[in-house]
Regions:
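Short, solvent-exposed turn/loop segments enriched in Gly/Ser/Thr/Pro and often Arg
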Residues: 1, 15-19, 108-119, 166-172, ...
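Histidine-centered active-site microenvironments of extracellular/periplasmic hydrolases
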Residues: 1-7, 113, 118-138, 144, ...
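Formylglycine-dependent
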Residues: 1-105, 113-115, 119-122, 311
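C-terminal cap/loop subdomain of S1 sulfatases and analogous C-terminal strand-loop tails that border
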Residues: 2-4, 10-11, 16-23, 30-34, ...
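A structural signal for well-ordered alpha-helical segments within the folded catalytic domains
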Residues: 7, 87-91, 140-147, 219-226, ...
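Loop/turn elements at helix/coil->beta-strand transitions in domains of secreted/extracellular proteins
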Residues: 7-10, 102-109, 158-164, 198-199, ...
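Short glycine/proline-rich turn/loop motifs
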Residues: 66-78, 124-129, 204-209, 323-330
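Long, internal low-complexity/basic segments
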Residues: 290, 295-296, 301-302, 308-315, ...
Length: 386
């Protein structure tokens, strides 16, 4: 029920998990001979799915009802297969573009590479390509994949009429170095520091977005849907979704926290419409940014083993003055923070407005919480309501 092909996508080909989960069955102490474990916990293989008009009532004991789609498991994503999976994914995307172009149909292609997620398994073609180590070699392969996709648009003569976005979903993962990234910002993926959230975002639309410009306004992945919808002629999708919107056979009534940033990107306005950003990590709100001010409500410095610290008074940082968030460790910081207490109240008000949106649009799914006491609390609450 969660596969893309029952949520608006015509086709889906890919894996469902982070790569380190995919290769877990190859560990020597993995319980290969325990049927219950295999049936309920083993990662699913690389899936090839297509949306259909025929409703398949088949019920899988683990994954649920098939519904209006076909699902073909092409086999596990083993360590060996990881070496060439990028070639497979690229070929699929190239074929999709070719078919859409031949049919003279506009298309949306969401190409997710497995680079650069741990663990990096490279073929001989990319091994030691850069002389800078495993991670740099993987980035070289990623660069090649992007280049091939852009070249395909050029070859078909549709590059000038195609919007291209390159981005990722979090900051660098540093703890797994040398099979991990780096950045000048404090922290990493999973933490509330800038290093956990700042990510590259490149957008190309020839004739509309001026090439070579660097924009420093706040921009979030939440802005992509309203912005791209505006580009294709629906500038008010956010407002329509609030009231209820029919797209094909599906009805949506949702709250998007994004902004239509097309005027900002195309030069129609001088600044980003986004003035705030919420730093969520798992089930915690670490911080809020508004304008240049970032207010830390809780902090930690180790993603997996670090203790979460909730300071009595939230900690303000001016990201224009201290973009790398280093000054909080300075002896003079408490005095500075005391002088800047006025920055906290606007953040509290922004948080209040944010929380009010959950009244009519509550979160659809709670994030995972591996604290056993919380699990027991939820279980007991559910039992009491029966």
């Amino acid at each position: 029920e969660y596969l893309p092909t029952v949520h608006g996508f015509d086709e889906f080909h890919g894996n469902l998990y982070h790569l380190n989960a995919e290769e877990e069955p190859e560990q020597p102490d993995y319980p290969k001979d325990l049927p219950v474990f295999q049936n309920f916990f083993k990662p699913r293989g690389v899936l090839d799915c297509k949306a259909t008009d025929v409703d398949d009532p088949t019920e899988d004991p683990r994954f649920g009802r098939v519904g209006k789609q076909t699902i073909r498991d092409t086999g596990p994503l083993t360590r060996k297969r990881m070496e060439t999976i990028e070639d497979d994914l690229l070929a699929r995307s190239m074929d999709f573009i070719d078919r859409a172009h031949a049919a003279d149909k506009p298309f949306l292609l969401w190409h997710n590479t497995t680079r650069m997620h741990v663990w990096t398994r490279l073929s001989e073609r990319w091994h030691d390509k850069t002389k800078f180590g495993l991670y740099a070699d993987g980035m070289q392969e990623l660069d090649w994949v992007v280049g091939e996709l852009l070249a395909k648009l050029d070859k078909l003569g549709i590059a000038d009429n195609t919007i291209v976005i390159f981005t990722t979903d979090n900051g660098a993962e540093k703890f797994s170095w040398p099979d991990g990234g780096t950045s000048p910002f404090r922290g990493e993926k999973g933490l509330g520091w800038e290093g956990g959230f700042r990510a590259p975002f490149l957008m190309r639309w020839p004739g509309k977005i001026q090439p070579g410009q660097v924009l420093n306004g706040i921009f979030s992945l939440e802005d992509v849907v309203p912005t791209v919808m505006a580009a294709v002629g629906v500038p008010d999708i956010k407002e329509k979704l609030l009231k209820g919107y029919q797209a094909g056979t599906k009805h949506f009534r949702v709250h998007l926290d994004g902004y239509n940033q097309l005027p900002y990107l195309t030069g129609g306005s001088g600044e980003s419409l986004r003035h705030e950003f919420f730093y969520y990590g798992e089930h915690d709100l670490f911080a809020i940014r508004y304008q240049n001010w970032k207010i830390h409500f809780q902090v930690k410095d180790d993603w997996f083993a670090g203790a979460l610290m909730r300071p009595t008074v939230p900690r303000p940082v001016n990201l224009r003055v201290d973009p790398f968030e280093q000054h909080m460790e300075a002896p003079g910081y408490p005095l500075y923070a005391g002088e800047k207490l006025w920055t906290i109240m606007p953040a509290a008000y922004i948080l209040k407005l944010h929380a009010e949106t959950f009244t009519n649009f509550p979160p659809r799914q709670a994030p995972p919480d591996f604290n056993p006491s919380e699990m027991l609390k939820h279980a007991m609450s559910a039992a009491a309501s029966v």
